Amino acid sequence: LGIIFADLNGLKDMNDTFGHAKGDQLIIRAARLLQESFEDGLLYRIGGDEFIIVFEGMDQFRFRDYMDKESHIIEKDSIFVSLGWGWTKNSASRERAQLDAEQMMYHKKAEYYRTHDRRRSS
C-alpha cells in the first residue's frame, strides 16, 4: 500500500489577498492536478488544502520506482503542491505509512518556503 500526502503551498496568501472564493478555486485546481499526476491512485481530500493519494495493490519496488520519477513538489500553472510518501506491506500498518508520508511532506514544504521566501526577498 503506497500513500502520498500532499499539501497545497500558498493557500493562506491566496485567501488573504484575493479572498476565500479564489482560495477554493485554487484547491479545486490542485485536486485536478493531483488526479492528473497520480491517475493510478485514489485521491482523497482530508481537509483544508491537504490530500492523500492511496495506491492499493502496488508492491514496494514499483511504488518506489514510481515515486523516484516524481518531484517532491508539483508545480503547474502557479500551483505548488508539496509531497511526501510512505509504503507498507499491509493495510494494518497504514497509519505508519501515512505518518511517514506526512512527515516527509512537511519537510519538503519547509524546504519550498525557504527557497520561495529567499527568491521573494532577492
Regions found by a protein language model. Give the residues of each.
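Short beta-strand-to-loop capping motifs
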Residues: I53-M58, W87-K89
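Conserved long alpha-helical elements within nucleotide-processing catalytic cores of c-di-GMP signaling
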Residues: L1-G2, N9-E36, Y44-G48, I52-I53, ...
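N-terminal hydrophobic or amphipathic segments with adjacent small-residue motifs
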Residues: D13, T17, G41-L42, K76-S78, ...
